A protein has these predicted regions:
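Structural recognition of the beta-strand scaffold that forms the well-ordered cores
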Residues: 5, 10-15, 22, 68-69, ...
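Solvent-exposed loop/turn segments at secondary-structure junctions
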Residues: 11, 17-21, 73-74, 99-101, ...
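Extracellular ligand-binding/catalytic regions of CAZymes and related secreted enzymes
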Residues: 100-105, 112-156
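Aromatic side chains
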Residues: 4, 19-21, 37, 46, ...
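Catalytic beta-strand/loop cores that center a nucleophilic Ser/Cys/Thr
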Residues: 44-117
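A glycine-rich, often tryptophan-bearing local segment used as a flexible ligand/cofactor-contacting loop or short
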Residues: 1-66
């Protein structure tokens, strides 16, 4: 992964990718630790999540980014809302999530790691994959990180 990123190749991180390399010294044999991966590469600051249960409302922070092309209106997620704030300097938040009684948190953003384009989302609960907005988000993320043109219309 380090060589991939050093070569300027893109990366998409979903959900638990934010803490995949931080085993806190408890990793299995052969596990490579990279405790700074979340902040350095993804641009996040994962420090836990809210309890599963409340539905997360997801809204755009901007309509002008190619990753958001064709995504109309707010949508919801049944997954636990992650707490990645504050994002690293240089990360660009695209979507914010909120649950009742808690502050909003970024749930999708872009970052640059060297020459590598990076997209991360804390969404990705199994039910999210049934959402047309989430599927469009992921398609757009692939297109943006790889330099392809974005979709121009929402999918049914």
């Amino acid at each position: 992964l380090r060589a991939h990123l050093a070569a300027g190749k893109p990366l998409i991180g979903v959900r638990t990718a934010s803490h995949a390399f931080d085993a806190r010294g408890q990793g299995p044999k052969g596990h490579a630790e990279w405790p700074g991966f979340d902040a350095e590469v993804l641009g996040g600051n994962y420090h836990g999540h809210h309890p599963t249960g409340p539905t997360t409302s997801v809204v755009s922070t901007t309509a002008r980014h190619p990753v958001l092309a064709g995504i109309s209106g707010p949508f919801t997620s049944k997954g636990a809302l992650y707490m990645p704030s504050p994002l690293a300097k240089g990360a660009t938040p695209l979507l914010m999530g909120s649950i009742p009684g808690k502050k909003s948190e970024p749930v999708a953003w872009t970052n640059q790691f060297g020459k590598a384009r990076v997209f991360y989302t804390s969404l990705g609960h199994e039910s999210d994959f049934r959402s047309p907005q989430f599927r469009q988000l992921m398609e757009n993320a692939v297109r943006w990180t790889t330099g392809m043109k974005s979709a121009v219309a929402a999918r049914p």
